Amino acid sequence: KWKNLVGKSFDDIVSKYDLFDWLEGREDEIGAFIHMGACSDTTETDADYLLENNYHYTVDLAEYAIENDIRFIYASSAATYGDGEKGFSDDHEGLLGLEPLNMYGYSKHLFDLWAQKQGVLDKVVGLKYFNVFGPNEGHKGRMASVIPSFVKKGLKDGKICLFKSSEPEKYSDGGQKRDFVYVKDVARITCSFLNNTECGIFNVGSGIAHTWNSLAHSIVSAVDFDVKIEYIDMPKDLIGKYQNYTRADIEKLQGVDDNTMTPLKDAVEDYIKNYL
């Protein structure tokens, strides 16, 4: 993670444990918070840790921002939508009915619900990121996008491994679909909220659901190497917690941003050829 700071310009680095002491007396110096901090491991089972780290800490920071009239932009997640049976609309009216599949998604959902219950969705910006991929994700380990590991394994073993379908009646092997969105687009959209006054919860995705097979073929095309696709069983700790389908409803986002997303094939090629 620290490698991502090399070559970057910043005024200070403050531990999350020291942040509120550091903030004391600096209310007039801060223009906005972009709060991305969280444990994003969808297989994390320590509920107390997730509640404290992802939920309570975010509540504390949001309360500080609201009290001091500071713009607060935070990362929610597409994981809050669960299996997608209730759709992927970012309309506030549907928040209460969402059922995340894992504790990570629930910890994010809890803050969305808190903001709604406290009546502050008109004072904060929640961005529900879908399947983000791109440069500087190596520190995320297993929770990074599959692209770096696919490239490494493809070049080493000549194959890319995709999960077999857990719902063969709905999806073929590799036919599960996700809304993949390039981190460069995500960064641009996130920063755009620093320059407008819009508030509420917004989906951040491409609005297109691509199959894993399609992603794999984009990788094969970018590496320009003979790579085969192999289907493997899903790890037991992911069964029942894995989203087989995501697609962002981006109508609301399109009202505040031009939302010109990089096509998947172009984004994958840029990532692989320029960063991996």
Question: What is each PLM-predicted segment?
Answer:
Residues 3-11:
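Short, conserved SAM-binding/catalytic segment
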Residues 7, 16-53:
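NAD(P)H-binding glycine-rich loop region in Rossmannoid oxidoreductase-like domains
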Residues 52, 56-60, 67, 71, ...:
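Catalytic helix-loop patch of NAD(P)-dependent Rossmann-fold dehydrogenases
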Residues 53-56, 102, 141-145, 178-184, ...:
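Residue-level signal for the nucleotide or nucleotide-sugar donor/cofactor binding architecture
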Residues 86, 113-187, 191-192, 218-220:
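NAD(P)-dependent short-chain dehydrogenase/reductase
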Residues 132-136, 162-178, 202-210, 232-234, ...:
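Glycine-rich Rossmann NAD(P)(H)-binding loop
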Residues 154-156, 189-238:
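Mid/C-terminal beta-alpha module of Rossmann-like enzyme folds, strongest
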Residues 251, 263-276:
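Amphipathic terminal alpha-helices
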